[in-house]
């Protein structure tokens, strides 16, 4: 089932080969500590298995957006507490998000001059992605329990800065991904499972 949707998701990720980009909104460096966003879980209530492919795709896109938004909140708050992501992700997608949070919290950051700068990162901007196609397939005896969302991810408006203010080196800001979202029968909820870089610009 094909869908077209432009989604804005504030996220951060380390410059990892898997994710191919990073993203989040940053706290205002001139603002007080009270202005820094507090991470909040956007996980919904328990839901039954999908009744159709359309329903599965809609649920998968919703949790994917929540996942990216929560990553942004976690990292904008300093990356020290990635626990809100556990309600939205599992497997490799959770590992990527936790590693991104650690990157933000601890550094070092490789800057555009290819110098590693110690200390935590700060970020600004947000990542956009556009769904190209999406489809469901069986997962652990649940019809349409696995949704693959093929998308163009655009991180051109997102920037990461090292602790000295220099901009971080980053890969191609526009690249193709297959996002995989699963229905977890035990938890009765949708979880982002994998972020697969296809290695192509878009």
Residue ranges and their predicted role:
Residues 1-10:
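Bacterial N-terminal signal peptides that target proteins for export
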Residues 30-46:
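Extracellular mucin-like PTS domains
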Residues 22-25:
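Bacterial signal peptide processing site
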Residues 87-178, 182-202:
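Structured, amphipathic secondary-structure segments that form assembly/contact surfaces
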Residues 5, 78, 162:
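Solvent-exposed, flexible loop/coil residues
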Residues 17-20:
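C-terminal motif of bacterial Sec signal peptides marking the signal peptidase cleavage site
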Residues 44-120:
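Core segments of small alpha/beta cavity-forming domains
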């Amino acid at each position: 089932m094909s869908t077209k949707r432009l989604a804005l998701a504030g996220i951060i990720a380390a410059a990892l080969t898997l994710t191919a980009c990073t993203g989040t909104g940053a706290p205002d460096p001139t603002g007080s500590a009270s202005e820094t966003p507090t991470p909040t879980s956007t996980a919904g209530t328990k839901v039954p298995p999908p009744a159709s492919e359309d329903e599965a795709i809609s649920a998968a896109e919703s949790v994917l957006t929540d996942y990216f938004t929560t990553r942004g909140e976690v990292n904008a708050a300093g990356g020290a507490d990635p626990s809100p992501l556990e309600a939205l992700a599992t497997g490799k997608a959770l590992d990527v998000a936790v590693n991104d949070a650690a990157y933000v919290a601890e550094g070092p950051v490789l800057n555009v001059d290819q110098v590693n700068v110690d200390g935590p990162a700060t970020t600004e901007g947000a990542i956009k992605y556009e769904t190209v196609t999406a489809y469901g397939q069986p997962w652990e005896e649940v019809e349409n329990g696995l949704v693959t969302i093929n998308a163009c991810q655009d991180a051109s408006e997102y920037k990461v800065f090292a602790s000295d203010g220099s901009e971080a080196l980053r890969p191609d800001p526009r690249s193709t991904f297959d996002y995989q979202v699963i229905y977890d029968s035990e938890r009765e909820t949708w979880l982002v499972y994998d972020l697969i870089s296809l290695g192509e610009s878009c």
